[in-house]
């Protein structure tokens, strides 16, 4: 079997794109720090992409009302960068297959908070998809 990497994409606590990430690594910068976007029950340092989901969706042209999970957004951004880096034509049929351990956790926590206060509340559709199941 032959495998060829044609393009790369990354969005992380160090930056958005291979250029920003490489510059941060070369400068010896750390992406680890206190969380700024999410509350946590424990005080631990994290590697956080410091853009909220709305801003991530805007990078992809996704309307705020249709924003998928944070994990899906990050994967789609990196995939779009990789497709662009590989100079794959816009008309080409390209798919993103993503397997994660925390997909949809942000949506699940928001749903649970609303549902717990009133079991008639919460947007079930936002957590019923494969990203959150």
Task: Provide a role label for each language-model segment.
Residues 1-133:
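Conserved "HGTGT" condensation-loop signature of ketosynthase/thiolase-family condensing enzymes
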């Amino acid at each position: 079997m032959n495998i060829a990497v044609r393009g790369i994409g990354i969005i992380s606590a160090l930056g958005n794109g291979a250029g920003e990430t490489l510059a941060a690594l070369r400068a010896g910068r750390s992406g680890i720090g206190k969380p700024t976007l999410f509350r946590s029950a424990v005080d631990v340092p994290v590697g956080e992409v410091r853009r909220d989901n709305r801003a991530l969706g805007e990078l992809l042209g996704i309307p705020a009302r249709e924003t998928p999970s944070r994990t899906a957004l990050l994967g789609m951004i990196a995939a779009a960068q990789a497709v662009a880096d590989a100079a794959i034509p816009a008309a080409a049929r390209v798919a993103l297959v993503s397997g994660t351990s925390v997909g949809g956790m942000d949506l699940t926590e928001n749903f649970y908070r609303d549902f717990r206060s009133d079991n008639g509340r919460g947007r079930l559709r936002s957590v019923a998809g494969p990203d959150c199941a």
